């Protein structure tokens, strides 16, 4: 993990630091995830995010990484089987989200890439097949797009 700290990726995120999730043990700075999920998070960063950051040449900020089930349920629109709960997903943003999305797709190591108006959701499965699914969030849901449409 070259460009992201564990605390940055594994905190159970709230808008303000003092509002971190009170339903899980991640209310303080931590260096280890529950249930041995460290390997998933490290694989996501090492295989997907660090190479993207290297090629992009500018900072990438993590909006949300790991989420405990209670926090995930409180996130509007979050899937009940969200990869955030498995430490397999991050929501990120940078100064050029479109370029970042293209870099991740070109690298070829991702499970799902969802383009939202202000951030990108990216996931990677350390174990099992990765779908290489590219979606765009629309007013009515999600639309599958090709790499050319990014």
Q: Where would I find each of the regions flagged by the language model?
A:
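Extracytoplasmic cell-surface/polysaccharide-interacting catalytic and binding patches
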Residues: 1-53, 126, 141-150
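Solvent-exposed, flexible loop/coil residues
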Residues: 8, 70, 75, 79, ...
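Generic recognition of cysteine residues
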Residues: 12, 21-24, 62, 68, ...
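Generic detector of short, locally flexible boundary/turn motifs and exposed helical patches
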Residues: 26-29, 55-60, 86-91
């Amino acid at each position: 993990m070259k460009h992201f700290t564990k605390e940055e990726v594994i905190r159970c995120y709230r808008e303000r630091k003092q509002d971190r999730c009170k339903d899980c043990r991640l209310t303080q700075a931590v260096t280890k995830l529950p249930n041995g999920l460290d390997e998933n998070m490290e694989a996501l960063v090492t295989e997907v995010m660090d190479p993207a950051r290297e090629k992009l040449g500018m900072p990438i900020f993590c909006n949300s990484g790991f989420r405990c089930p209670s926090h995930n349920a409180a996130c509007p629109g979050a899937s009940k089987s969200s990869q955030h709960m498995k430490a397999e997903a991050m929501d990120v943003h940078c100064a050029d989200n479109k370029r970042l999305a293209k870099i991740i797709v070109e690298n070829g190591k991702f499970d799902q890439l969802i383009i939202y108006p202000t951030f990108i959701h990216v996931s990677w499965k350390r174990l099992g097949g990765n779908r290489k699914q590219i979606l765009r969030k629309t007013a009515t849901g999600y639309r599958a797009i090709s790499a050319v449409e990014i």
